[in-house]
Each structure stands twice: as structure tokens, then as C-alpha cells.
Amino acid sequence: MLVISANEQRNLVNMNEVIEYAALALKEFSAERTITPIRDSLPFANEQNTALIMPSVAEGLEALGLKVVTVVPENKKIGKKTINGIVMLSDFQTGEPLALLEGSYLTMIRTGALSGVATKHLARHNAKTLCIIGTGEQAKGIAEAVFAVRDIEKVILYNRTEEKAYAFSQYIQEKFNKPAYVYTSANEAISEADIIATTTNASTPVFSKKLQKGVHVNAVGSFRPSMQELPSHAIANATKVVVESKEAALEETGDLQVPIQEGLFKSSDIHAELGQIISGEKAGRESDEEVTVFKSVGLAVVDIIVAKYLYERAVERGVGERIEF
């Protein structure tokens, strides 16, 4: 079995390729060619933390794997990662353990790639300004993926802890050579944006202002019914609301459950799964005036396909540590 660390994965990744693999996984899922159960969400430590168990089989892509991650928001106070985990791949023919990959970096890259796919199909082609609300680790993958599919000229940042936003601003400028500005108001930050990404652990909406015409939103933070990043009117008034999996999104996120409970949105109002747009079954953006929202909760098959991509790259380059059971 090959063990692949976060640093080794970092040196293997080409974001454009990861976006392509994520799109392939989404397309297979929406065509019902995978077995991807709704993940098990296990609260622990008085429900402050969450363990997520995510298996998937993709027959046509010959991929089989399991992801286990923990989300511990308070870790950031002690300088530790809020997301920790592993992804295990099995040999599709023999069932033998094939690889074990560090899971937090893979999650960050996968999360970014999902937003990259959504941005490619749902954001205006002339989008130039990206606003990111929440500047933790997941924001790094989102920024890189959005930069891969749109010619972004300006980045606007908002974070509840301002120092972290300034640190992220420096990261954007140094790694991508793009100007990044820190705002002290989330409402002001979104007012100038063509693309908005929310990646927080918020239980109440992170902004209140109405979305402007033509904007696209990637909302990736809310993965439990008790979490809500977007105000209900953002979902209710959107031209198109798109998800990875209708079943998973309706069960797992307060971003949809709250407006449904308030009578502002119905499950039938979901425009499409992202895989249906990729395949051409459903339309993506159709005009520059549309307001589009991609509500992401994560999807195990995407993790497994991205893990397979990383494994194949590692084998090609002789990267990773082989261990025997």
C-alpha cells in the first residue's frame, strides 16, 4: 500500500486536471453510475465536532474508496487544522488496500475543484472580481480553482478575525500575484463581487444584503442542518440553485433547510445537480443577469476520484512510501 502525505500531494497537483477529474466524477454521479450513499455525520464532544464517513464506488471509473474526516472548529485556537482525515483507495479488481492519502489537503483541493467546476459553468465569462468570505484553509483551494477558470483581476476578503484575512491577502498576492483587499463589512465586500465564495463554520448568515444581478455564489461551508451561511433570500431569489446531490443537499445543509422551513423555497426549486449541467442535460448560466448559487456539501465520489488521480500521479513519479501489512 502506498502512503501519500499532504506535502507529496501538494507537489503532484495540477488544479486544471483536478477540476476535470471532479467534473467527471460529478457527471458519473448524476448519471446514477456510482454507489455514493449519503455520508454518515457523527457529532462528538457535546456536538461541537463532527466525524464524516464517506464511501463510494464508481464502476465506470474503476474506483473504490472511503474517506473519513473530522471537523473540529476550535482547533484553530490552538494552531491545529480544523479538518483532519484520511482517504483509503482499494484495488478495483482484487479489493486489496491500494493507497492511504492524508485527507485534509485532499479535501481542500477537492472543495476548490468543485467550486471551479461550478464557476466554469455558472459564473459570467467576464467575471473579474472574486469575494471570499472566510479565509481558512478551504479558501486556498477555492481561490486557486476560480483563478483556473476565470481571469480574476481583484480579490476581496472578509473574515471575522481580521488578522487572518490580512494573512490570506498576503498569501494571494505572493502565490498568485493578484491584488487582494480586506474589507471590514461582509455586505460591502459582496457588493463589488462578480463571484462570491463563502467558506465558514457559521450557524447564521454571513451577510444580509441582497445579491446583485449577474453574481455567482459558491457556498461551501454549511454541511449540517444547524449551519447556515447564506441568508434565506439569497436562495429564494436566485435564478438557479445548483447542488452536487439533491438528496444530500436537502438532508445536510441549513442553507436549504432553513428557507424551505420558512416557506421561501421548495426542494423542487433546485435547478439541477452540477453533473447534469456538465453533461448538457440541464442548462448552466444562460444570461449575464442571472443570479446563480452552487450549494456544496461535498460528495464522496469526487474525493475518491481525486484520490485516484493523486495515486496515479504518485506512481508515475515514484512518490510516496510503500508499506506492507
UniProtKB/Swiss-Prot annotation:
Pfam families: OCD_Mu_crystall. GO terms for molecular function: oxidoreductase activity. Coiled coil: none annotated. Its EC number is 1.5.1.49. Keywords: NAD, NADP, Oxidoreductase. It catalyses: L-proline + NAD(+) = 1-pyrroline-2-carboxylate + NADH + H(+); L-proline + NADP(+) = 1-pyrroline-2-carboxylate + NADPH + H(+). GO terms for cellular component: cytoplasm. PANTHER family: KETIMINE REDUCTASE MU-CRYSTALLIN. Catalyzes the reduction of Delta(1)-pyrroline-2-carboxylate (Pyr2C) to L-proline, using preferentially NADPH over NADH as the electron donor. Is likely involved in a degradation pathway that converts trans-3-hydroxy-L-proline (t3LHyp) to L-proline. Belongs to the ornithine cyclodeaminase/mu-crystallin family. This is Delta(1)-pyrroline-2-carboxylate reductase. It comes from Bacillus cereus (strain ATCC 10987 / NRS 248).
